[in-house]
Amino acid sequence: MEPSSKKLTGRLMLAVGGAVLGSLQFGYNTGVINAPQKVIEEFYNQTWLHRYGESISPATLTTLWSLSVAIFSVGGMIGSFSVGLFVNRFGRRNSMLMMNLLAFISAVLMGFSKLGKSFEMLILGRFIIGVYCGLTTGFVPMYVGEVSPTALRGALGTLHQLGIVVGILIAQVFGLDSIMGNEELWPLLLSVIFIPALLQCVLLPFCPESPRFLLINRNEENRAKSVLKKLRGTADVTRDLQEMKEESRQMMREKKVTILELFRSAAYRQPILIAVVLQLSQQLSGINAVFYYSTSIFEKAGVQQPVYATIGSGIVNTAFTVVSLFVVERAGRRTLHLIGLAGMAGCAVLMTIALALLEQLPWMSYLSIVAIFGFVAFFEVGPGPIPWFIVAELFSQGPRPAAIAVAGFSNWTSNFIVGMCFQYVEQLCGPYVFIIFTVLLVLFFIFTYFKVPETKGRTFDEIASGFRQGGASQSDKTPEELFHPLGADSQV
């Protein structure tokens, strides 16, 4: 392997850093709605009282609040499904740049919702920033995967998740009552998203377009070669160009890959199934139930200062994402995902025990904090970062946009289901709500063990070739045999 293949150049750092500002936006808007729940609900009540002359009913308030949380995911579903419309027409970098218009519109709507006495403005703003984040969850892993050398693809791909968790942590800190999570400043808390949008608009014009897009989609070999030299910090980019040209030749032999074709073709059916299930394993693990409703969970657990415990979980979240960043290229994607799922299942059982015995044993509140922190830590070992970038690894340039759209749509749909339903399910099941997530985590562990290949150290074309070979005779092979060409020997 060439020394340049592991070189982290200034231009590569700029490209990845500029892109993951979008990831930070996603994380911020996921976490920002949690801490100021009570003051925003009071705004809803006052607005209702001003309009209709009576206080809002508890059932209506619960529905409006759940909608405010979950409409973000509806926007994300629409945005994620639209990824392919933009990246193939405008390119990866320009698509990220254009989408900041949505962030500015959303910031205005949410920032002026209190002044306009309109909770509809807030909900619409949440929907629009959801569309932005849905697009971002497709654009960023795709762009980062395509500009990164093979040896750094996993580590740099994890930066998308790091951007998300840093965004969540910033939202939790800004959401403190003493900072912006109060009656006067909550509109600013929701609209501060214009700052990273502005910063991304400044940085992205200096970032290169994806060399794979330039060569394979646009057939601009000279531009692709020039970009590669800057990204790799070397004049010899022969190996990268050869690999891209081989992928381009393979793409020309294939017909245009639509979303339906992903499910019809034997060569794509297995990787798209893996991509979708890995996305579901991220969202249906219960992690967003913890993020969206962590403050109220800590309150129920008897924690005196629940918002600080929530911030503690955000710090754990960030720290273990950094750990994953350094081990993903050594341990491999599959191994880390399995460890994460198993650890989360164990912590979910602990959480259930702690919440169930809280009234009899007050000290169980401490166990609930340990369980939540452990749950978050194991999430960031595998199920947090890996599903985002492994989708881009499982597909070659042709089917990649369609595959990322399908995987992203699956992610956001399950995100919406959890965001909309968790409060109701929690009211129904009480302390046993996390048993549901435990069962799902065990099922995802079994699927990952038998079906998910190791992609560490493999080029995009090598991975795609493994699936093409497997697709030709799937019925005659066990899962282990099917994925042997993809590097089962490199698993830890």
From Swiss-Prot:
Offer one example of a GO biological process linked to this entry: long-chain fatty acid import across plasma membrane
List all topological domains (Extracellular): 34-66, 113-120, 177-185, 294-306, 356-365, 423-429
InterPro entries noted in UniProt: Glu_transpt_1, GLUT, MFS_dom, MFS_sugar_transport-like, MFS_trans_sf, Sugar/inositol_transpt, Sugar_transporter_CS
| Residues engaged in binding D-glucose | Q161, Q282, Q283, N288, N317, E380, W388
The residue ranges crossing the membrane are: 12-33, 67-87, 91-112, 121-144, 156-176, 186-206, 272-293, 307-328, 335-355, 366-388, 402-422, 430-450
- UniProt superkingdom: Eukaryota
Q: Which SUPFAM superfamilies match?
A: MFS general substrate transporter (SSF103473)
| Residue intervals annotated with topology Cytoplasmic | 1-11, 88-90, 145-155, 207-271, 329-334, 389-401
Q: Which residues carry this modification: Phosphothreonine?
A: T478
Q: Which residues carry this modification: N-acetylmethionine?
A: M1
Pfam assignment, any one: Sugar_tr
The catalysed reaction is: D-glucose(out) = D-glucose(in)
Q: What is the predominant subcellular site recorded for this chain?
A: membrane
Which parts of the sequence are annotated with region: Disordered?
Answer: 468-492
GO CC, alphabetical: apical plasma membrane; basolateral plasma membrane; cortical actin cytoskeleton; cytosol; female germ cell nucleus; female pronucleus; glucose transporter complex; Golgi membrane
Could you tell me the keywords of this UniProt record? Answer: Acetylation, Cell membrane, Glycoprotein, Membrane, Phosphoprotein, Sugar transport, Transmembrane, Transmembrane helix, Transport
What is the activity regulation comment for this entry? The uptake of glucose is inhibited by cytochalasin B. Glucose uptake is increased in response to phorbol ester 12-O-tetradecanoylphorbol-13-acetate (TPA) treatment: TPA-induced glucose uptake requires phosphorylation at Ser-226.
Q: Which family does it belong to?
A: Belongs to the major facilitator superfamily. Sugar transporter (TC 2.A.1.1) family. Glucose transporter subfamily.
Under which name does UniProt file this protein?
Solute carrier family 2, facilitated glucose transporter member 1
Q: Which organism is it from?
A: Sus scrofa (Pig)
Gene expressing this chain: SLC2A1
